[in-house]
């Protein structure tokens, strides 16, 4: 199981993980409303363990995404919920949650205390942590945490903000060299940077690097593609794949989302993705 400590926006990622017939545990909060109940019901239907999801007033915040006529994200605003109930869950039940997990998926722009507690537990039980970001203005303040993530996934613009450089207009080849140099000098374990239709570049602190092209598919709706990509990378690395192979899994899951109007990936068996994992009933 992968354990995800995150706000409601990461519900899609936990569903993507569950749709590869894995059994993730979701550590989060939801509203005390009918909408909150519906979220939990849907996650349970996907065979997600929701034992550590707390219902609190205003627990899901408000999220608005604006898309242009090509279906690409043009802007977004958000009102974040109070996430401290997640910290209380980790303080009370963190040992049992993390000790049973195969790895941890963590939102980087979550409260610092939650990040610190998660890393503390991950270190205690020798678990890998994979990071992703939604609110860049908050995440950039947490830049010093990058070296604690076994792998971090972001897009081209976010990577530019992290490294205080402008990557607009860079080719995949150019960006790959730049990211590799930055990752090696900053001693960040590994990073994957998505480039939309141009695919993704990846690099680790040992100097391994590469480019993985996007799959040529008919684009119906890009909503959720980044979440599926990240879920695929985290799944691959959790179960022993090299960075390139993990990016390949992420690319496949992202393509499966883009070609439909659904914002989560369809069901896959682990063996279809080259994963030698027994599926739990």
Placement of each model-derived feature along the sequence:
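Short beta->alpha connector loops
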Residues: 32-33, 109-113, 134-138
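Conserved phosphate/ATP/ADP-binding segment of small-molecule kinases
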Residues: 123-128, 133-209
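Alpha-helix C-terminal capping segments
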Residues: 12-23, 236-240
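Conserved N-terminal subdomain of the carbohydrate kinase-like
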Residues: 19-102, 271-281
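Conserved phosphate-binding/catalytic region of the ribokinase-like
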Residues: 169-281
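Single conserved hydrophobic/aromatic residue that forms the stacking wall/gate
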Residues: 1-6, 10-13
């Amino acid at each position: 199981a992968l354990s995800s400590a995150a706000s409601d926006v990461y519900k899609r990622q936990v569903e993507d993980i569950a749709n590869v017939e894995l059994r993730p545990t979701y550590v989060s909060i939801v509203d005390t409303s009918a909408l909150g109940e519906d979220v939990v019901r849907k996650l349970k239907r996907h065979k997600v363990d929701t034992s550590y999801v707390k219902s609190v007033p205003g627990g899901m915040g408000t999220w608005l995404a604006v898309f242009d006529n090509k279906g690409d994200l043009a802007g977004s605003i958000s009102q974040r919920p109070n996430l401290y109930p997640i910290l209380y869950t980790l303080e009370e039940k963190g040992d049992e949650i993390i000790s049973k997990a195969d790895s941890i998926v963590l939102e980087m722009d979550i409260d610092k205390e939650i990040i610190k507690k998660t890393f503390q537990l991950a270190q205690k039980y020798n678990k890998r942590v994979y990071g992703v970001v939604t609110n860049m203005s908050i995440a950039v303040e947490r830049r010093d945490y990058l070296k604690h993530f076994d792998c971090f996934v972001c897009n081209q613009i976010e990577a530019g903000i992290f490294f205080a450089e402008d990557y607009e207009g860079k080719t995949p080849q150019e960006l790959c060299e730049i990211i590799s140099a930055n990752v090696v000098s900053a001693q960040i374990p590994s990073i994957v940077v998505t480039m939309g239709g141009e695919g993704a570049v990846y690099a680790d602190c040992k100097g391994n690097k590469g480019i993985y092209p996007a799959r040529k598919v008919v684009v119906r709706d890009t909503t959720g593609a980044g979440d599926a990509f990240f879920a695929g990378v985290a799944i691959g690395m959790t179960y022993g794949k090299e960075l390139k192979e993990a990016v390949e899994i992420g690319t496949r899951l992202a393509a499966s989302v883009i070609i439909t109007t659904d914002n989560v990936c369809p069901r896959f068996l682990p063996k279809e993705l080259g994963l030698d994992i027994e599926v739990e009933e």
